[in-house]
Structures are given as C-alpha cells and as structure tokens.
Amino acid sequence: MNVVFECSMPRTGSQLIKSVLKQNPDFAIQIDSPLHFKWHKFRKEISLEPTCSTLTKEELSNRMRGFWLEGLKGWGKAINPKAKVFIEHNRFWADDIDIIKHFFNCKIIIILRDLKDVANSLENIVKNHNEFNNDFNNFYVYKNSAQLQRTHKFFEHEMIRIPLTAIKRIIDEGMFDFVHFLKYEDFIKKPQQELDKLYKFLELKPYKHDFNNIKDMDRIDTPMLPYGRHSIVSSLNKHKKTNFTLKEDVIEFLETEFKWYYERFYNE
C-alpha cells in the first residue's frame, strides 16, 4: 500500500471528489484525519526522550520513518484491507511538504478552486448559519465593508492560510514532481478525464466511475465551523452553482492579493 497526502483548502470540493474516488476499491479514503496532530506531538516528545541519545541520527530517522509509514499504512488497511493507496487527509499536512517529500517519500494531492468561490461559499455559510459562529463578525472598520473584513478573516485563518502558502511555495520552487493539482472546475466539467490524470500520477490503472451514483462518505459535520458543512450531490448532473454574493471590493481584493494564484491556475 502506498500513502498519499491530501491537503487542500476548505470549500474546494475535496469531499465530493473523495466520495467519487471511494467507488474505486483500490483506495482507502476517510474524512479529516487526526494523524497529523499525532505526528507533531510524536516529534516533539521523541526529541525529549533520553533513550534516543543512544541512536545515531540515521538510525533514529530510519526507525521513525518505518514506524510512521507502517502506522499510516495500517490505518489505511483498517479502512480498506485490499486498498493499494491510502489517501491521508488533513489540511495541515501542507505545512510539512518537505517531510512528505524527503522523509516519507510520498506524493501529495491538492484540490484547487477559484478563490472567489471559496470566499463566496464561506460567506454564504457564515451569513446563513451564524448562530454558532463568532469568529467572523464584530467588524468595526468604517473604510472597509463588512464582507471585505470577513474575507480578510477567512484568508488569515490557518485552515486557508497554511494550504494556500504551501501552494505558493510549490509554484515558486517548482515542486511539481510529487504534487498533483486537480482543479474543481475542471472536475465538474470533465470528471472522468481529470481522474484519469490523477490515476496516471498515482501510477494506478484507470477506473470507470459512476458520476450519477455518488455516495457521501461517513462523516460528522460540526455546526461550530463553517468549513465543515457538506452537502454532497448524489449526481454531478444535479450540481448547482452557489448563489454568488461577493461585492466588487472583495473580488478586487482577491484578484489583486492572490494574483500569483490566478496567473498560475486561472489565466484563461
């Protein structure tokens, strides 16, 4: 079994795409994983472990790698014992792309979406389901609209900031040999063709998916976070574009602040 890391921004359609991929018995797929946080805790604690001082750097690195890779594979096999690929998902793995490449020697999948649609999706959730939210209100700056201030807050939040800065670094440093970008918009238009590209990247044989019979993955949404509200369509034919509510000042901010993103992925 190979381990592949998926660390996309929220509201990019990654849950929909993984729900489709789960049709393929070659995959072990789950929702958000707790393993990234355990990895960081493990690294912190092992650095304080005195018995590790008896090992050389190479010995300790090899044992850590073996322990964690087998642990990740074991987690995946518990999901699907016959799987060839385990997709380990947590947005914050984007903070560890060097670890993934040089230590785990694994590949990364990142789902992309127009940032205006990401912001629009969050805006609609926050405005329509604000009863449990207090992170994205209480703005009192007169020169900027409330919507623009909310958008600033969205993109300052770690859930977006960490994956997005990782994407910029991948572009700046040309780290495309182990990263596959899949655009949500392309998937909606040509789903099988886009997944065929993914299979080629993962060195798997193509699989014919049923895009009219999509079953949602088991998951528990949290009412406390706008990022975790999912409504997966059962068929791509039923896919509807979200009502667009962003104002011109927000659109200008996103297209200016993230010009590099649009030039690389949406320069059409």
Please identify what each model-predicted range represents.
Residues C7-S8, I87-R91, L112-R113, Y184:
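Short His-Asn-centered micro-motif
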Residues T12-K18, H36-W39, A94-I97, K116-S121, ...:
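Short catalytic/ligand-binding loop motif for oxyanion handling, primarily in non-cytosolic enzymes
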Residues W68-W75, N120-F201, F258:
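PAPS-dependent sulfotransferase catalytic domain
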Residues M1-G74, E131-K153, F211-W260:
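PAPS-dependent sulfotransferase catalytic core
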Residues W68-D98:
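Glycine-rich phosphate-binding loop used to anchor ATP phosphates in small-molecule kinases
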Residues G13-F27, I100-F103, F181-P206:
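PAPS/PAP-binding and catalytic site of the sulfotransferase fold
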Residues H89, I100-N124:
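Conserved phosphate-donor/acceptor-positioning beta-strand/loop module used by diverse small-molecule
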